[in-house]
């Protein structure tokens, strides 16, 4: 069996100032690392969304009744009942782009670094794997 990925979450109790306004919204979920088999029979680690107050139940991206508060999500992770937290984007006016496998030895590859530099007015972070980047900003559309 493959070893569970290392999770990089930072200090969840003190969210960065750029994301602080999002904590007032009831759009938060948690996720555990789960090892699943792909259609080809290989094993792959996934991060399925779970309800912040009850991580035994799935959260759905199109069902706000399955989302919770930031405080509930952080408490669930701190109790060890999930590995990380997530924010549901649907209808929020927030958009995110994940750049996978673009961090090498702690530094973004050149094209990813350039893209991030051009994405003014956004918040950027390293993904939980430590190997990717996420760009978060305001968005319109579905």
How does the language model describe each region?
Residues 1-142:
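Conserved phosphate/metal-binding and DNA-contacting active-site motifs used
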